[in-house]
């Protein structure tokens, strides 16, 4: 506190990935959580993750605008901001609350090439148009780092681009910035990558898993309970 001052943002995720809400007054619980944060700092902002059933609508309704910041945790796969194509679609998104367009990308620290370039770009600009009053930035929410840096470069550049662009256009600039030269061979390689391994067409929990990491079985489909060993690119 002496070095950094009093914190402004406080994270709390009640009933995350389960937890029984039976008999719980969710509105009252939400208010109590925020009140505890306000005792530490009267300007405190509650940061909450949007994942599965969270944040509960009753809590969203009970908290005043400006007191909560929602992380749309996996905007590239299961957004809740109001994308009708999402399996976790919410018609009103997060209502009056500010939120961040986040990319989860990595699950469980698995290492491998993976991304959804088109989905990340299209989703961001659709969200900015539909929720321009509450969308206030982007976030990275990965469970592992030191892989797929191109995807983070792409995501973090989005807020700086007022006009929508294509991944093909962006990749050309990325190649020049990454290698410090304009080489047609490098552009070709990265265009191939952006159309295949970095443009996954479906929802999945990160990179393709190796069957050698799975438990022995006659048929192996994944190494983890959430992943997939099915290739999505040629």
Annotate each language-model stretch with its function.
Residues 1-194, 199-232:
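Catalytic-core regions of glycoside hydrolase
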């Amino acid at each position: 506190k002496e070095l950094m001052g009093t914190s402004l943002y406080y994270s709390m995720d009640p009933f995350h990935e389960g937890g029984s809400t039976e008999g719980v007054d969710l509105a009252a619980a939400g208010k109590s959580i925020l009140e505890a944060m306000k005792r530490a700092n009267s300007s405190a902002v509650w940061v909450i993750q949007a994942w599965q059933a969270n944040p509960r609508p009753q809590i969203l309704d009970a908290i005043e605008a400006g007191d909560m910041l929602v992380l749309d945790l996996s905007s590239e796969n299961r957004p809740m901001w109001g994308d009708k194509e999402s399996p976790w679609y919410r018609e009103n998104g997060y209502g009056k609350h500010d939120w961040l367009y986040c990319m989860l990308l990595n699950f469980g620290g698995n290492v491998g090439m993976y991304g959804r370039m088109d989905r990340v770009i299209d989703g961001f600009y659709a969200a900015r148009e539909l929720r321009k009053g509450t969308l206030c930035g982007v976030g990275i929410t990965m469970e592992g780092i030191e892989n797929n840096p191109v995807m983070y470069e792409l995501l973090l550049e989005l807020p700086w681009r007022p006009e929508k662009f294509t991944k093909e256009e962006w990749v050309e600039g990325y190649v020049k910035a990454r290698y410090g030269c304009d080489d047609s061979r490098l552009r070709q390689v990265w265009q191939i990558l952006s159309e295949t391994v970095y443009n996954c067409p479906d929802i999945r929990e990160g990179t393709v898993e190796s069957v050698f990491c799975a438990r022995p079985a006659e048929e192996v489909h994944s190494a983890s309970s959430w992943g997939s060993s099915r290739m999505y690119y040629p």
